[in-house]
């Protein structure tokens, strides 16, 4: 059969590359054992690909979306369409997809600065934020930080077992608390994720 010929050719190619027959056979055995996992991953990828393709069709992605713009950001049909596609794919109300948003810290800074105003307070009930957010918040002094704009910060550390300190959180909440940030990633801290 065609598949048997393909397998024989593959085995020969591996042998020519110096892969010993026992190693090759072991790899084939492991691949066979993982076949169901690989199939599951492939199905997830296929589902996600279809989700993206459906969103592209729904939002009428076309060659016009790839045309150059004036550079001022007005009437950029490509950007507007791309953001609608992202919102549909991720099931969100809206999306910002810009090359100017360079990293996760940048995205979080934009979110915090868009929601907090002078006199407001940001609460972190999971302890200290990721290192790069310290300057954004103003834990470490920085020009343009939330603290510089009169936004205070309070944190409640997790309990030694990694659970929320519910009593501490209740005490920390006050009339100034406008936003609570829960960071799952531990960053460089030794706490559990």
Task: Outline where the language-model segments fall.
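Conserved PLP-enzyme active-site core in the AAT-like
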Residues: 5-26, 52-53, 65, 74, ...
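Glycine-rich phosphate-binding segment of PLP-dependent enzymes
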Residues: 28-92
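Short, Lys/Arg-enriched N-terminal segments with co-localized hydrophobic residues
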Residues: 1-2
């Amino acid at each position: 059969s065609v598949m048997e010929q393909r397998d024989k050719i593959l085995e020969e190619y591996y042998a020519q590359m110096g892969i010993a027959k026992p190693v090759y056979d072991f790899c084939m055995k492991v691949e066979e054992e993982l076949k169901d996992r690989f199939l599951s991953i492939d199905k997830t990828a296929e589902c996600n690909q279809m989700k993206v393709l459906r969103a592209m069709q729904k939002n009428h992605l076309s060659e016009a979306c790839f045309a150059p713009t004036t550079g001022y950001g007005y009437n950029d049909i490509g950007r507007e369409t791309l953001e609608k596609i992202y919102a549909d794919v991720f099931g969100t109300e809206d999306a910002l997809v810009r090359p100017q948003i360079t990293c996760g810290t940048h995205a979080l800074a934009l979110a915090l600065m868009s929601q907090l105003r002078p006199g407001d307070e940001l609460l972190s009930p999971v302890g200290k934020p990721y290192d790069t957010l310290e300057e954004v918040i103003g834990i470490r002094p920085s020009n343009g930080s939330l603290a510089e704009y009169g936004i205070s910060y309070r944190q409640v550390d997790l309990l030694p077992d990694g659970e929320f300190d519910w009593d501490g959180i209740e005490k920390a909440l006050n009339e100034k608390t406008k936003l609570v940030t829960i960071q799952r990633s531990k960053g460089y801290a030794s706490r559990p994720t």
